[in-house]
Amino acid sequence: MAAWMAGRQKWLLHPAAKPLIFMVCLLPFAWLFYAAWSDQLGANPAEALVRATGDWTLRFVCIVLAVTPLRVITRTPALARFRRMLGLFAYFYVVLHLLSYSWFDMGFDVADIARDIAKRPFILVGFSAFVLLTPLAATSFNAAIKAMGAKRWQLLHKLVYLIAGLGLLHFFWMRAGKNNFNEVFVYAAIVALLLGWRVWNHWAKARRRVSNNAAVGVH
């Protein structure tokens, strides 16, 4: 078991690991590009592109949230080195989502987009998630961490929890029009599990600290 864990850690630290995972993260984009070029997006390709890019945004947000639990549970610290790249891919797909909506639904008409944001709550919520995700992407580099300080940087990046909630609400309202919530419940369960683990882990750490302090006090 120990040898297997060491081998996994060694592979994740290999110079080829990041480029390989980068290429894997690009696969959804490559497929969408090919499907659009070869006319395989169905009867409504514009809607398919808007929907698919939104789905992949939410999936990557879930993947980012899963990094810390997986790192702790599997005792694989090297997983943390991929979190920044995964977060940037979440931003990449949300930009594609926004561009698809702005182009295919709104024709890049800024006034129409502004009216739509003001008129439809689920568009407002989705746009708010994009706005909040932007500073996270902009400060995902070492220079930003150094400039902001680690504590302020960590506080800013806790916005990912709010972003996940807004993304779920956006998806829920979008699905409400079709009265189809199956996928919404799946994503909500995943996010709840990942956030619930964080609450439990924080509580467990606090309890261990209290126990350790009590043990020191006895001695």
UniProtKB/Swiss-Prot annotation:
Q: Where are the transmembrane segments?
A: 17-37, 88-108, 121-141, 153-173, 184-204
Q: Which GO terms describe its cellular component?
A: plasma membrane
Which purpose does this protein serve, as stated in its record? Part of the MsrPQ system that repairs oxidized periplasmic proteins containing methionine sulfoxide residues (Met-O), using respiratory chain electrons. Thus protects these proteins from oxidative-stress damage caused by reactive species of oxygen and chlorine generated by the host defense mechanisms. MsrPQ is essential for the maintenance of envelope integrity under bleach stress, rescuing a wide series of structurally unrelated periplasmic proteins from methionine oxidation.
- Chief location of this protein within or outside the cell: membrane
Biological-process GO terms, alphabetical: protein repair
Q: Which keywords, in A-to-Z order, does the entry hold?
A: Cell inner membrane, Cell membrane, Electron transport, Flavoprotein, FMN, Heme, Iron, Membrane, Metal-binding, Transmembrane, Transmembrane helix, Transport
Q: Which cofactor does it need?
A: FMN; heme b
Q: Does the keyword field hold Transmembrane helix?
A: yes
InterPro entries for this protein: Fe3_Rdtase_TM_dom (IPR013130), MsrQ-like (IPR022837)
Q: What is this protein called?
A: Protein-methionine-sulfoxide reductase heme-binding subunit MsrQ
Cofactor binding description: Binds 1 FMN per subunit.
Keyword Iron part of the UniProt annotation: yes
GO molecular function, a single term? FMN binding
Q: Where is the protein found, in the record's own terms?
A: Cell inner membrane
Q: Which family does it belong to?
A: Belongs to the MsrQ family.
Q: How does it sit in the membrane?
A: Multi-pass membrane protein
Subunit architecture: Heterodimer of a catalytic subunit (MsrP) and a heme-binding subunit (MsrQ).
